[in-house]
């Protein structure tokens, strides 16, 4: 008789199933001015965006590949198709989405989540959104939740032009420049002054195409006194060639506003995940990051928060699970500019079967940030002797009137704890999985229940076969 797990079991194939590729259009692999110009025409860009793309390409060609983190030698942009258009236009009614794409999102639970607990959903498949919808009562509050292309070409065009890649300019690093040249898809959100969105919005990104890249752009503006919780989910089937994800997230938190940005990333183990996320927080604003990173072959993820206004604050809560063949280099950065600002980073890193997990924290306190407070706590759990976990803190404090602290711990699973749980009827695998889930509860307890269950399921999948 099989033992019942403490969480519902799911099959890894839910994420790894590959749909037949019925693309309406696939750009040739590589990156040239002709390819970027062709993409711009395909997207019907305004002149300023076409020029922005070509300028970003020029910057891309001038910048070097970062060499201070995991090796990116296995990534060759000449073998990556930067744009793949699915065989459908964006729909606002799920019934009109093509059946094969609909089946994929059904397996991933997107429609069920929308019905149960979401104010709006956007679903991107390869390079374009195929579904986007927002509940009428949320739209009635004046909340704007649409795809980036509609915002760029519609009544929010001026707002897009004002904010687009101002927080993350193409000069930031080589993959930011790549994003500026070939971005496609993503979501645009504007929450008006004083509006509190009581249930989350979600965007889900699925990369099905082999040897392709996904470069969605997310732009969120939460106006004065407003609040929002935005959830981002990502997955892809596994191929024997490299795929690339180089999205960009720009978040603007206005005076006394609050934004929580939650991410569950479960990319396939052939993915290079080089996402860039950044937030600008004004006076009295609150920025909360909740991050769970489980997939990809190589991951470089360092959300950055700029605490510009007085009394602004940031919290980052994250968990990373690096298994066999994975090198996940993650962390967070905060820049204190305003007075009496505060930041707190609380992370958990787990590594097994030779996986490498690295946490980088960066705290900058400017001269103007008198009374700033910052605390960083990182705990690492290594499940075997082949795995590796590193913590790399960096602090740049430019005023004496600041309180900054850093704490790091590295450990392994206690044999006594496993024995105790086994004496209560658990298998060794279930006991170890439960301990790891408890270790990562700093993230799961911050998520809506449906997403906490998904995260625990992902941990359980990663733990399978970890005995011995």
PLM region spans:
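Conserved beta-strand/loop scaffold segments within soluble protein domains that form the structured core
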Residues: 131-133, 137, 141-426, 440-468
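N-terminal amphipathic, basic helical "cap/leader" segment at the start of enzyme domains
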Residues: 2-6, 10, 26-172, 176-177, ...
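Low-complexity, polar-biased intrinsically disordered regions enriched in Pro/Ser/Thr/Gly
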Residues: 19-23, 92, 171, 237-240
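Short acidic (Asp/Glu) and glycine-rich catalytic loops that position anionic groups and cofactors
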Residues: 18, 33-37, 396-397
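Flexible, glycine/charged-enriched surface loops at secondary-structure junctions
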Residues: 68-71, 428, 451
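Intrinsically disordered, low-complexity terminal tails
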Residues: 2-20, 28-30, 451-467
